[in-house]
Amino acid sequence: VGRRFFLAMPTIVILAAMLIRPAGLADVPAMTDTLNWAIEHTDVIFRASPASIAEREDYLRHIWKEDCPCLIAESDSGDYLGWALYDPYRDPRVWTGCYETTIYLSPTAQGQGAGTALLGALVDAARADDKVHSLLALIVSTNVASLKLHEKFGFENVGTLKEVCYKFDHWLSLTHLQLLV
């Protein structure tokens, strides 16, 4: 595979009837569907316009170029559950060692432990990755499930940007959480 974090952790992790594995280009359509569902039906992401598969393929290639993990959760029967990654926060030449997490679950997978499995694998990968010092999670303040999930893994609330996006007829605030790995 050739990316450092894969050398420090198993390529495939099986957790309680769930498989966590590296993402490939074949996963991009399902990943894009999940992202677009969140864009169109929730306020957990500020973006208002849907993503294209080509755009998300380019983004996955960028993640790989940055030597960062992008993970997929599948049920033991092979059903896609969601995805997670971390990538450099802003300009990595300035924000040395600082990476931002992203997690999206299929709407049918929410509340089944997929988020816990993905974030656990992501934190483990970050702890094994010499270039990572800090993980950030920028979460819409009304997304209580995601806030609690990150806090379960030791992320601490380090501040909130108030009313920074207007979507679905209301203002959204963005909570910043941080984990030093």
Could you tell me what each predicted segment is?
Residues T32-L60:
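Conserved GNAT-fold acetyl-CoA-binding loop/helix
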